[in-house]
């Protein structure tokens, strides 16, 4: 684990093809995961804050690959940019992701941000490489009934349906994350020089769609451009405030658009 203080400034082709194909051979969902998906329960959101420039992140990246295969989990890889100065500029690092992580730190009362960090359902803060702790946190979050079950309509570029329900007094933020299925990167410099790193569900955009105050909402997503650029999927997250507990979420593959 590598920490970064708030006060500081932000931190072979054939082989790559083989590794990219190995995304299809991920660990299959557990029996509990399959039961959760079949029951129609809202999925658990797992956000990994990571960087290809951090040498403690690859085990967490591999764990997220495993989690991305589970139907009861919305697994997102958010690459931060504050480690870019230490030798390797992460090609997927973004100040948008760094800002989201900092907001979580404030909401959860943390003194600093660090990588690899996993946030489960906007509530639980974990070191992202501690697999057993992460899996236990997912099971704990799955047992907590969410307020909302979101749905997608694929026609016309996509639309998300948020049912009526009880909203927090301050309302809830509706987020849209668009992500790539996976990337394989041969790192040339920095702490991971010489390593080939795999990343799954790499977030490329994270935008606010609006505010939910308890009413039924149908929000057009206009994902045709993202699909044309080869993006793999999207997730809609309804979250108390801006970085509070997650009230509901759903994910959709963009190749399902009509």
Protein language model regions, located:
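Bacterial N-terminal signal peptides
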Residues: 13-28
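Ligand-binding face of N-terminal immunoglobulin V-set domains in extracellular IgSF glycoproteins
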Residues: 118
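Active-site-proximal cofactor/substrate-binding loop regions of enzyme domains
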Residues: 32-112
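Intrinsically disordered, low-complexity repeat/linker tracts enriched for polar/charged residues
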Residues: 10-11, 15, 35
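Short, conserved sequence motifs used for protein processing/export or organelle targeting and
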Residues: 91-114, 123-258
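Short loop/turn motifs enriched for small/polar and acidic residues
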Residues: 78-81, 121, 155
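Juxtamembrane/transmembrane-helix boundary motifs in multi-pass membrane proteins
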Residues: 6-7, 39, 176
């Amino acid at each position: 684990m590598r920490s970064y203080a708030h006060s500081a400034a932000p931190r072979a082709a054939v082989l790559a093809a083989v590794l990219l194909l190995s995304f299809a051979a991920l660990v299959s969902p557990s029996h509990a995961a399959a039961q959760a998906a079949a029951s129609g329960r809202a999925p658990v959101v797992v956000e990994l804050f990571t960087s290809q420039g951090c040498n403690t992140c690859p085990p967490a990246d591999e764990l997220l690959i495993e989690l991305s295969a589970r139907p009861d989990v919305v697994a997102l890889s958010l690459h931060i940019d504050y480690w870019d100065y230490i030798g390797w500029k992460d090609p997927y690092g973004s100040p948008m992701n760094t800002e989201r992580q900092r907001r979580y730190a404030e909401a959860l009362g943390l003194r600093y941000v660090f990588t690899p960090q996993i946030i489960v359902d906007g509530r639980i803060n974990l070191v992202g490489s501690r697999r057993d702790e992460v899996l236990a946190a997912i099971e704990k979050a799955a047992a907590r009934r969410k307020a909302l079950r979101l749905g997608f309509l694929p026609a016309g570029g996509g639309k998300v349906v948020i049912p009526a329900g009880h909203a927090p007094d301050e309302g809830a933020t509706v987020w849209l994350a668009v992500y790539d299925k996976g990337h394989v990167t041969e790192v040339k410099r920095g702490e991971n020089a010489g390593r080939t790193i795999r990343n799954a569900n790499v977030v490329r955009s994270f935008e606010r769609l609006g505010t939910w105050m308890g009413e039924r909402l149908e929000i057009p997503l206009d994902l045709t451009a993202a699909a044309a650029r080869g993006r793999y999927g999207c997730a809609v997250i309804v979250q108390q405030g801006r970085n509070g507990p997650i009230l509901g979420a759903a994910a959709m593959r963009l190749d399902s658009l009509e």
